[in-house]
Each structure stands twice: as structure tokens, then as C-alpha cells.
Amino acid sequence: MNRDLSKGSVVKSMLLFAIPMILGDLLQQCYNIADTLIVGQFLGEKALAAVGSSFTLMTFITSIILGLCIGSGVLFSIRFGQRDENGLKEDICASFFFITAVTILLNIIAYISLSGLRTFLRVPDEVWGDMKEYLFVIFMGIPAVFLYNYFASYLRAIGNSVIPLLFLAVSSILNIILDLWFVIGLKLGVAGAAKATVISQYLSGIGIMVYTLMRYKQVCAIWKIRYLKKERIREIISFSMLTCIQQSVMNLGILMVQGLVNSFGTVVMAAFAAAVKIDAFAYMPVQDFGNAFSTFIAQNYGAKEKKRIQQGLKAAVRISAIFCVVVSTFVYIFSKPLMMIFVDAKETAIIMEGVRYLRIEGAFYIGIGWLFLLYGLYRALGRPGMSVVLTVFSLGTRVALAYILSAIPAIGVVGIWWSVPIGWALADIVGLLYYKIKKQNLVEKEPEM
């Protein structure tokens, strides 16, 4: 199932590699969709607001792990393109030890800081009880998030995007079954929804680890100290930490916006919780396509296939644009029925606020589609620092505008919604201008690791 992306048709290579990744992440969204749908329909508005705020926080925490795994995956792709098997083993060993340590530390910090989150996120009293109960359980799944994303990153780096999809498919089905059983059958409340997600996460995490260790002997280097080199650890830290910073800054900005949203009350919180799930589901395919594109570029960068890099970029821009136009049209037209999937039809105030959010965000998905391509391009060319710059620029603009615009009485909460596409557009302009100016140097020079 391995795929050498430095050979064959450019468009076909990218699409065949990207499709399983897209399907896989759409299934992963089903983890969160199942929680939101069942909680919203059977546990009510306050529980939905609690799970929605928890989702934003967990996205921030797991983004740190995800960033480290994505960064390591890019290095794996470059080594694979270079046919450097020994270097690949050393990177595997160094990255596994480092990310394991970070995961353990992160899990400890999450539990220690649990009580302080109430003030930081401005969580209303009537929501905090459910939110705390949900988070206490969901934090147990952090190690599982690491296991799945680490081994999935390795498999994708060598061109295998099918196996991660299969493990996610099984765990997603299990998640939905357990959600229904725990919440509706056993009446376990929000804790039941969290338990369903955690059990499913461990199934996919442990399963993909066992498969990868049995199928690819070079991955057994994670246990072999002789492959643990100081220079590789420095390389992993310098490269992966920048990708980690990019992912965590991205979600820290969203977390700050969540705090602002919470200050507008339970109705806006619930609308945001449901709409964000739809939003993430809608643009998740272009995010995954951006990650697949990054692997394509990294393998070709390692193989020194400069012409294919240029061809791949042009093709990716067109593919992303076509997809975004289709999805934007769908979300804009069907925003109300989409909201009613998560919210009872009687909750008209929540539905209408969610519709307003979706029609503003949905009209500009092409902005985030191209931004994901730029993130992937700069990571793959060994310039993760530029991805961080674009993320800080986009999120900085978004957070600043959200606070400024929402403070104007005539604009209010809608200012938060408009800040998002504006941030996307400005970051796109900066990223494209930088590429246009530095194009030749980016492809010619060695990666900055």
C-alpha cells in the first residue's frame, strides 16, 4: 500500500493519496459529531454548550501533539524520498521518545489546570458542572491521540494513507454505538459521551501501533537506543516544535475566541458549538488535502524533483478551489437544515445564530483551502517557520478583529464571525507574496532543520 509520490501522474498521485486521508478525517470528525448530535438532542442546551466548549479546549491540547506528529511526518517523507533508511530509523526513534515525553507532560498539566479553565474560558455557572465532568474523562484519551497520530503520520509519510482510514472507520462505528448506549441506554450523561470517545480513540491508537510495528520492521527502531542520536533529537525539536507551535497557536486563537463567544451567553455558545462542528466538517477535506499535498511535496523535495513540485502546486491550487466552491454553495444553501441536525427545531434562536455564522464562514472557504496549501508547502520545503508566521498573522488578525468588532454595539457577535474570513484572506496574500519572491530559493536550498 506504500506509494512513491515522486513518480507517475502528478494529479492522480495526489488525489489517490489524499482521498483516504480525507475519508479518514471525515470519520474522525464523526467522533465529535456523534457527541454533539446525541448530547444536543438528548441532554439539552446546557450540555451541548459544555461539550462544545470542551471540544475547543481539547482541540487546542491535541493540536500540540498533532503538530509534533505532522512535523515528524514531514521529516519521514523527506528521508523516504532520499531513500535514507538509516536516517529514517534515527528520526523515528528520536521523534517517538520526544513526543512521548511531551504527551505525558501535557496529560499531567491538563488535569492540574482543570479547575482554572473555568475563569480563563469564562464558562457560565450553569454550564461548568457538565463541562468539568466531560473534560475529566476526555483527558484520559490524550495518550491515545498521540498513538494514532504518530503511527498514522509514519504510514502517510511513506505513502500509505489507507490503513489509517481503516482503523478510523472501525473506531468511528464503535464510537457511535457506545454513544447511543452510554447516553441514551445507561443514562450516563456527558460523561458517557466522553467515555465513548475515549474508548474508540484507544482502539484506533493501539490498533494502528500494533499493525505498524508488525508490518514495518524499521519502526521497531522506537525501542532501540542505538538509533537515539543527539543531532536527530535536535532536528526533531527544531522542526517539529515549529509545526507544533503553528498548530497550537492556531487553536489558542480559537480558544481565545471561544472565551469571547462564551461571554455572549448560552444561546450563542450552543449555536457556536453546533456551527463549528459543521464548519470543521465542511473544510476538513481541504485541510487533509493540504496535508496530503505536503507529503507529496516533501517526497519530491527529498528526491530533488523540482519540476514535479511546481506542477503539484499548480494542480493543488485548482483542485482546492473547485472543492471549496462546491462546499461553500452547499453550506450556504443548507445552513438551516444542517443546524437542525444538532439542535432541536424548537430552539429557533440557536438555529438562526448558527445559520448566520455558517453563511458568513461558508462563503469564504476558498481562503482557508489555499491557506492549508501554503502551510503544507512551507513545511514540506523545510520552512516550518513560515507556516508559523502565516498562522500567527491569520489568528492574530482574527482575535484582534473579533474583540474589536464585537465590542461595537451595532455589530456585536457577528463581528466575531466576520473576523475569520478576513484573517484567512490576509494570510493568503502574505503567503503567496512570499512564495512569489522566494520561489527559486525555496526549492533550491536545503531545508532549515
Where are the regions that the model predicts?
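Short alpha-helical transmembrane segments in multi-pass integral membrane proteins
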Residues: M1-A18, F76-G141, G185-M241, I297-F364, ...
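Hydrophobic transmembrane alpha-helices of multi-pass small-molecule transporters
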Residues: F60-S63, N175-D179, G205-M209, F281-M284, ...
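Helix-terminus/linker motif at the lipid-water interface of multi-pass membrane proteins
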Residues: C30-L48, R118-D125, W181-L188, S248-K277, ...
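Small-residue-rich hydrophobic transmembrane alpha-helices
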Residues: L48-I108, V145-P164, A271-S335, I368-L390
